[in-house]
Amino acid sequence: MKCILALKALYEKRESAMKLGLFFHKFKKRILSMTQDRQPEITSECMQLLRLISEHYVGVFSSMEYVFLFQFVYAAYRPMATAAGELICKRLLAPPPQEGVFGQNPPDEFDRNIQNMKTLIDFYLQGEFHRHVPYLVDGLWDAAPALVRNWECMTALLLEPRGGRQALTSQQERVLIEILVAAVRQAAEGHPPAGRELGKRASREVDGTRRWRERASMSRHFVKVLPQLLSKFAADKEKVTPLLQIPQYCNLDVYDKDGLGSDLDSALLELDCLVQRHSDVAVLEACARAYGAYCCEGGSAHCQAAPACSRLVDMLVDALTPLLDVFLQHEKQGQFLGHHEMGRICSTLRRLVAFYSTHDLSSWNLYEKMDSLLTLRRHQGSMPTEVIHCALQCTYYALLWQIVAATDRLPPQVGEGLGGVRCGYG
């Protein structure tokens, strides 16, 4: 460690760095191998040393050696990941133009960020660490804030028309959405993803005022563009599902403070369309959680969102009731419904189950309807598996919400002891 720190001090000065060329070429392999040391503090200091060395010598590392070093942005130790992120910024991404170098026509900063984001997406796709987007974002969080926190750049790329000058491929869009959602989460929560170690000397305190301002700015941006994003990617469940997480991380009070009621209407309309369009469980559960964020009691979106959610559930229950009546009648007579009718029953039940997992639907008496189904199953002995499964899920959530309601009526001392029943729903 002492040797690395001493070398860092020398390489921070160009005069002394230029005298160490032969030394580095002799010990290059040894220094590179130290990035894999067992002590994380040594690996991060070594990565910072290599970044300094790369700034002084042209062509000092081969392309394969750079690829090897860049992958440490996914390291579990945050200082190491940040150091690798700094190297990525220096060697992979286009730097901001220096004053006077380009005369009167410097490159447009927005276009530069667009190109850097495309480069970052391709870097991720070419790597071997898929499913680690939050780690990549966190590794660049301090090294490239103008890139990974550039909401305008990311959403502009996603909203680029098909065939446009900056249009992405479908695979690039999917990765950018993952990057966007990971960055939104980190901006809202103020801490790295789970599993990333901060380091001994890292400050765990976050400037609350700065984070509040960043979140407010982020929220004002997304309440305007989220309806457009949901509309564009409505047909693609893999892309729209992560986008539906964004409302959970935004400060939705901006709807009231900034007079953005029409944007809220647009977001709720898109949610309604998604629920009616999709029957995939992941999409439906994401829609239910998004509605939950908008319907939060005391929030400025509650007055518009809660009635919209109730109307949607009304529509689903109204559609389900006659279907169930016909289904029960056929089952009692030993007859079978057609494939189309069974599909409608199952898809409607899936939608209601998704909402029941997040919202208290006790007012719609779904328990009684599900009890009728399960009673018939007990007597008749045959019923489609998915219908039984959905009926059991509805019954399960109905009972859980009754427990929640009973807990809320208990004295505080008793209710605190039962607080764990809320975990996983509500």
Task: Please name every model-derived segment.
Residues 78-89, 148-189, 367, 371-400, ...:
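Hydrophobic, aliphatic-enriched repeat segments that assemble into extended interaction scaffolds
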Residues 97-254, 364:
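Extended repeat-based solenoid scaffolds, especially LRR ectodomains
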Residues 1-4, 44, 82, 131-134, ...:
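Alpha-solenoid HEAT/ARM repeat scaffold
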Residues 278-320, 324-364, 377-381, 385, ...:
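Charge-patterned, phosphorylation-rich low-complexity C-terminal interaction regions
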Residues 30-38, 71-76, 117-125, 158-170, ...:
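Helix-loop junctions that connect tandem helical modules in alpha-solenoid scaffolds
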Residues 1, 8-35, 53-80, 91-121, ...:
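HEAT/HEAT-like alpha-solenoid repeats
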Residues 3-14, 31, 35, 46-57, ...:
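Hydrophobic residues within the alpha-helices of tandem HEAT/HEAT-like
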